[in-house]
Amino acid sequence: MGDTFIRHIALLGFEKRFVPSQHYVRYMFLVKWQDLSEKVVYRRFTEIYEFHKTLKEMFPIEAGAINPENRIIPHLPAPKWFDGQRAAENHQGTLTEYCGTLMSLPTKISRCPHLLDFFKVRPDDLKLPTDNQTKKPETYLMPKDGKSTATDITGPIILQTYRAIANYEKTSGSEMALSTGDVVEVVEKSESGWWFCQMKAKRGWIPASFLEPLDSPDETEDPEPNYAGEPYVAIKAYTAVEGDEVSLLEGEAVEVIHKLLDGWWVIRKDDVTGYFPSMYLQKSGQDVSQAQRQIKRGAPPRRSSIRNVHSIHQRSRKRLSQDAYRRNSVRFLQQRRRQARPGPQSPGSPLEEERQTQRSKPQPAVPPRPSADLILNRCSESTKRKLASAV
């Protein structure tokens, strides 16, 4: 596995929150990692400035502390106590240029652990505003023509465009309503099957099952099945609704064999395979209680449950049937059980090759017993006397 690094950082805008204070502003960054995954993170300007100060302390030469002419780390103005919305808007251009310059620095800086840790997803980045908040956060997006050319150094992030196949009525303030035919840009594809999208000045979460790519009905980013399976644990009970789904109780262990982007993964429980909501699963060995607290809504609807679907494509999506999953899974399990059985070593195994080599080596010849005359000529006087007495 290669080293972890960031390919690109793009500023999307800022969010004005009214909890805990009126002046709580967070900037939204879209971070593209080495595996092409894109994550949205939120950072306050004071946090960014503290990160900047630590970075300068770590690299004093590149920060110009010794010789100002050697400075390559970009400048960042200190925050003011009463920065309001106008200041937040002004900071956007500064932060866009700052992030672009960071990505163009030598790898010892642009890929240092301090920078990577700062832009990793935190638990707060995943928290959605609750419906009982008296005043919702206000989101201000960067204009598309307001991006600095400095971000072109590593290549800009192009958001994918999808089309709504049916009407969707939002069920919470953090979601976004859709009408059939609406075209949206996808900012983040969550494994839960809820995607964060934007349409003009609106932003919100949408079930992936209500969206289709413009160029093909198939989702090209869906990975291939992995019949070896990954161990997961159910963190919330679920009762199957469709015949191709699996019911699980909280705490039951399963193997995930296909991670689909619509949030409905194919799992294996003993020899049974079927669909299960990914947001109710957690990798084995990880903190279950924290994952349970992050469940803010129900599982997204499946495509098969959506009524009045209108697709622009002539053919439907290519999907493996449950029979295909079951056959391939059984075949893999049988092969794994055969390999696990103890038995004679195969002809090509290293142990058998070593045994064959030992058998093929010629044994050393036993030398003949010397004659009595030869012994008398070459032995000592005491040996001669013993031989004479024996005769």
From Swiss-Prot:
It is found in: Cytoplasm. One of its GO terms (biological process) is respiratory burst. PROSITE patterns: PX, SH3. Residues 286-391 are annotated as: Disordered. Pfam families: NCF1_PBR_AIR, p47_phox_C, PX, SH3_1. One of its GO terms (cellular component) is NADPH oxidase complex. The keyword Cell wall biogenesis/degradation does not apply. One of its GO terms (molecular function) is phosphatidylinositol binding. Residues 157-216, 227-286 form the SH3 domain. Residues 1-126 form the PX domain. SMART domains: PX, SH3. Residues 310-319 have a biased composition (Basic residues). The modification Phosphoserine is found at S304, S305, S321, S329, S346, S349. Transmembrane segments: none annotated. Its main location: cytoplasm. Keywords: Cytoplasm, Phosphoprotein, Repeat, SH3 domain. InterPro entries: NADPH_Oxidase/PX-Domain, NCF1_C, NCF1_PBR/AIR, NCF1_SH3_1, NCF1_SH3_2, P47PHOX, PX_dom, PX_dom_sf. May be required for activation of the latent NADPH oxidase (necessary for superoxide production). This is Putative neutrophil cytosol factor 1B. It comes from Homo sapiens.
